[in-house]
């Protein structure tokens, strides 16, 4: 396949055209007065979204060089979304502004490598300044404000997320699901819940609710199958003497062992129930260990030289209550020591930081939530499926932004924080490095300009008003059209979102600026196929 090569200004200009087209599609969604983008789907109804990364992912350009530029900035949006959960439109708008401003200077003769070095120094100083002016999130009111802004000024979503975080804590898992009605709902499951139900309906104690309810039970944890009753007898005899209920969590319980447990339950000899251990393979072992730490027990494991026959009451965990239905088991108020639980939580956090797999990260976060004290489920309601999907995207964004705010703190929102931080950064640079720093400073106005423009205000006037103000909390409220104290007005952004958006935007823009050649496949115009031979149509000779 023949290749097409472009050099220097020709290459960069065509890359810029792709970046511009992507930016033009994404930037209209920015701010509280941002517009919707309608996206055609290969099947079904088109989707409507105000989510920057959803728009960016759909942009594929016909020209291969332009598409290379667009795909690099598309990666900026996607990476920002993965790292911070929000700020995708900010990152796209910044990347375009930096590339546009940089291209003008490089075309005029500036050295792109020196320009890049100056840009990197300016960004490092800006990030330090953002951290200096950041405030810690102090309560559910600020959490609600952050979530509201990220959900495109939907206060009901902000309140839902604030309530969810208040109930399960900042490390708790909050999941988003589609509701079966048009109303939004918040359901909270306290304690540790895992997706395994009772092994036999004969264990049920509450026939009305069809669930097993155990009060102050002992909890036996075993990492293998239990088939032989003889292995279980010693611990069952000890349990019977205490008169307390027993929950057995094992890989499986079958045959003679399960039948005997059911008979003893029905005869009232033992108040007992059994469930399969959650997860598979190594994850099952880890989750059994989590349950052991939460309940103050030990996992009876043959790998550690322990047999089921050797189990004593000291090896068993305890909890204030256990509720089991056909699908789930919930352990409430485990008797484990707080120091041991905290150590386990820190261990899982370290694993989350190290893993590169999204799947592993998700499963580790689920384990973290179960240990931290609960799971909240936000059920999003809407009148139509299209509206439901759009709203669910906004809730996901708001949830990610809220977590980012709790993690690194908050700064003034509405595109003002980057401008205010840049006024406080004074670097002693010269030559093309100084040009690089100035390119970044100029580009930092772009998010505020776009927010004002989308809201129907004069972008130049708004940007200038914020730039000349000496008040670090000063900014523009695009909803009311007023200049306000942004913290008092509740217009705030997570530092992490601003930081990640800026870092990723500068990273890709500087790569584009230092590009000196592009190589792409040359699209060949294929000739039209020849008309087929019509010789077989002799029977039509009578036509005039």
UniProtKB/Swiss-Prot annotation:
ATP binds at residues 29-32, 50, 86-90, 414, 477-479, 493. This is Chaperonin GroEL. Forms a cylinder of 14 subunits composed of two heptameric rings stacked back-to-back. Interacts with the co-chaperonin GroES. Its main location: cytoplasm. Belongs to the chaperonin (HSP60) family. It is found in: Cytoplasm. GO terms for cellular component: cytoplasm. Its EC number is 5.6.1.7. Keywords: ATP-binding, Chaperone, Cytoplasm, Isomerase, Nucleotide-binding. One of its GO terms (biological process) is protein refolding. Together with its co-chaperonin GroES, plays an essential role in assisting protein folding. The GroEL-GroES system forms a nano-cage that allows encapsulation of the non-native substrate proteins and provides a physical environment optimized to promote and accelerate protein folding. It is an enzyme of class 5 (isomerase). InterPro entries: Chaperonin_Cpn60_CS, Cpn60/GroEL, Cpn60/GroEL/TCP-1, GroEL-like_apical_dom_sf, GROEL-like_equatorial_sf, TCP-1-like_intermed_sf. It catalyses: ATP + H2O + a folded polypeptide = ADP + phosphate + an unfolded polypeptide. Pfam families: Cpn60_TCP1. It comes from Campylobacter curvus (strain 525.92).
